[in-house]
Amino acid sequence: MDCGLYIITDEILAPGCSHIQIAKESLSGGAKIIQLRDKRRNAAELYAIAQEIRSLCTQHHARFIVNDRLDIALAVQADGVHLGQDDLPLSAARLLAPRPFIIGVSVGTVEEAVLAEKGGADYLGVGPVYPTGTKADAGPAVGPGLIRSIRERVAIPIIAIGGINLTNAGDVLAAGADGIAVISAVICSPDIAAASRKFADLMIHS
């Protein structure tokens, strides 16, 4: 899986900015993966939003991932779904969505990472690397050291997430991350496209 700048949409953190607008501006700034994350909207609303983002990602040759909602991901022919430890079990998701459909899994320990790879995950979301206020149930920060430890044990791509900004992103990549997932450092910026471009440029030169 080709990694790069991975943007997660969140309308709560970016009031007045829709999922579609976040995706559009992030893609114009060089994002390679967009994840739609919304725990509030009903299925019909999410489906309509996901269709729009799917189209945008296709235009920009980027991947589109849906958080948690495998049904929505399959319905709009998204590239994949991202699952947390308390979401639909990886084994069940893989039965419903064989490869090349992408399944990413959030992990916070080496053991979870190894199990996810063995279970058929295509990439790992590792974090929170640094303290973050983006996700209330994110747990304690694990630091770049966990990325190094996981990198030694698994072969699938690692996407680092949690408290990542332009100051610490280089350290995360140096620790072995294949990509970085960014939320507030981009979507809370007054210029989402410009903020995305800075991260994309940093990754190219790291």
Swiss-Prot record:
Q: Lineage of the native species? A: Archaea, Methanobacteriati, Methanobacteriota, Stenosarchaea group, Methanomicrobia
- Keywords carried by this UniProt record: Magnesium, Metal-binding, Thiamine biosynthesis, Transferase
Which residues take part in binding Mg(2+)?
A: D68, D87
Q: Name one Pfam family in it.
A: TMP-TENI
Q: Does the keyword Transferase apply?
A: yes
Q: Which gene encodes it?
A: thiE
Listed binding positions for 2-[(2R,5Z)-2-carboxy-4-methylthiazol-5(2H)-ylidene]ethyl phosphate are: T132, G133, T134, G163, I183, S184
Do you know which PANTHER family this protein is assigned to?
THIAMINE-PHOSPHATE PYROPHOSPHORYLASE (PTHR20857), THIAMINE-PHOSPHATE SYNTHASE (PTHR20857:SF15)
- What biological process terms from GO does the record include? thiamine biosynthetic process; thiamine diphosphate biosynthetic process
Q: Which cofactor does it need?
A: Mg(2+)
Record-annotated residues binding 4-amino-2-methyl-5-(diphosphooxymethyl)pyrimidine?
A: Q35, L36, R37, D38, K39, N67, S106, K135
- Cofactor info, note text: Binds 1 Mg(2+) ion per subunit.
Name used for this protein in its record: Thiamine-phosphate synthase
Function text: Condenses 4-methyl-5-(beta-hydroxyethyl)thiazole monophosphate (THZ-P) and 2-methyl-4-amino-5-hydroxymethyl pyrimidine pyrophosphate (HMP-PP) to form thiamine monophosphate (TMP).
> Under the GO molecular function aspect, what terms does this record hold?
magnesium ion binding; thiamine-phosphate diphosphorylase activity
Would you tell me the Gene Ontology cellular component terms?
A: cytoplasm
This protein's pathway reads: Cofactor biosynthesis; thiamine diphosphate biosynthesis; thiamine phosphate from 4-amino-2-methyl-5-diphosphomethylpyrimidine and 4-methyl-5-(2-phosphoethyl)-thiazole: step 1/1
